[in-house]
UniProtKB/Swiss-Prot annotation:
Its cofactor is Zn(2+). Transmembrane segments: none annotated. Zn(2+) 1 binds at residues 17, 19, 103, 251. This is Dihydroorotase. The modification N6-carboxylysine is found at residue 103. The gene is pyrC. One of its GO terms (biological process) is 'de novo' pyrimidine nucleobase biosynthetic process. Pathway: Pyrimidine metabolism; UMP biosynthesis via de novo pathway; (S)-dihydroorotate from bicarbonate: step 3/3. Homodimer.
Length: 348
């Protein structure tokens, strides 16, 4: 006789960092998010990037058109900051409810970020306007100088960019996205109520050994890159502590298989199908399931000044196997934990 499976009921979560891409890829991946999450902060790094209200409205409609009937999902749009962005356009989008936040990519830090910001000084008028109107700044926190080691880029960003910026614009709300280091965990924990962070499932579950020992695992390659074990442990301890300015942001970032399994592969984990169960596994391992709902469903809305979702979902603790791949029009998509047996999954 099998033991009854354990069920975890939580308020419907939100994903505060998500890549949906565009075109056929968007149509394939949207349902994996919209069936579980009430809202998601949608990244603007398309080609070309989303830098105008008009582009954001059109992109939001393409996303909504891809949401299956019966799913109640709201995409929250972001503006891609560039050196030439007009502060008035940004403010208009925020006031009209089109832009929820703006995204700072250091130029060439990650996928489709060649249009990114060359220096914080270059966009200071925009950042000052954001501070004035209360618009959150979302930051990919890595320096991109060629001489700085890839494993050190987040820590260096804190001292050279993040801290000077926050000293200068003390009222600016900042989300330090997808943090990966003890340095960042400590920095956010020691910060004030205007600084928060998101953490991905892969950075909680894995460290760089998992990606590199016994063969390179391209589907664990993302940016910021997985770090050593001490950093992974610091992230796990931060979420397990119940700290209320860290929240769910999957950074789910789909690439077709041939673009991942390549001599020069793309960065990004497509974790939308398995992220929530992965987070539950980590919280269970840390004996911190009492803080799971807040991380998924409460801390984010609280920081953004939005209401929590009023519906609930259930996760069930029973072993299930993750699909090896998901069909695309002319390729396949390999989900995070493909082919593996997972402990927690969303109850259908």
């Amino acid at each position: 006789m099998t033991a009854p499976s354990q069920v975890l009921k939580i308020r419907r979560p939100d994903d505060w960092h998500l890549h949906l891409r565009d075109g056929d890829m968007l149509k394939t991946v949207v349902p994996y998010t919209s069936e579980i999450y009430g809202r998601a902060i949608v990244m603007p790094n398309l080609a070309p990037p989303v830098t105008t209200v008009e582009a954001a409205v059109a992109y939001r409609q393409r996303i909504l058109d891809a949401v299956p009937a019966g799913h109640d999902f709201t995409p929250l749009m972001t503006c891609y900051l560039t050196d030439s962005l007009d502060p008035n356009e940004l403010e208009r989008g925020f006031n009209e409810g089109v832009f929820t936040a703006a995204k700072l990519y250091p130029a060439n830090a990650t996928t489709n970020s060649s249009h990114g910001v060359t220096s914080v000084d270059a966009i200071m008028p925009v950042l000052e306007r954001m501070e004035k109107i209360g618009m959150p700044l979302l930051v990919h926190g890595e320096v991109t100088h060629a001489d700085i080691d890839i494993f050190d880029r987040e820590a260096r960003f804190i001292e050279s960019v993040m801290e000077p910026l926050r000293q200068r614009l003390t009222a600016l709300k900042v989300v330090f996205e997808h943090i990966t280091t003890k340095d960042a965990a400590d920095y956010v924990r020691d910060g004030n109520e205007r600084l928060a962070a998101t953490i991905t499932p892969q950075h909680l579950m894995f460290n760089r050994n998992h990606m590199l020992v016994g063969g390179v695992r391209p589907h664990l390659y993302c940016l910021p890159i997985l770090k050593r074990n001490i950093h992974q442990q610091a992230l796990r301890e931060l979420v397990a502590s119940g700290f209320n300015r860290v929240f769910l942001g999957t950074d789910s970032a789909p690439h077709a298989r041939h673009r991942k399994e390549s001599s020069c592969g793309c960065a990004g984990c497509f974790n939308a199908p398995t992220a929530l169960g992965s987070y539950a596994t980590v919280f269970e391992e840390m004996n911190a399931l009492q803080h799971f709902e807040a991380f998924c469903s409460v801390n984010g809305p609280q920081f953004y000044g939005l209401p929590v979702n009023d519906t609930f979902i259930e996760l069930v603790r029973e072993e299930q196997q993750v699909a090896e791949s998901i069909a695309l029009t002319d390729d396949t998509l390999v989900p995070f934990l493909a082919g593996e047996t997972v402990r927690w999954s969303v109850k259908q």
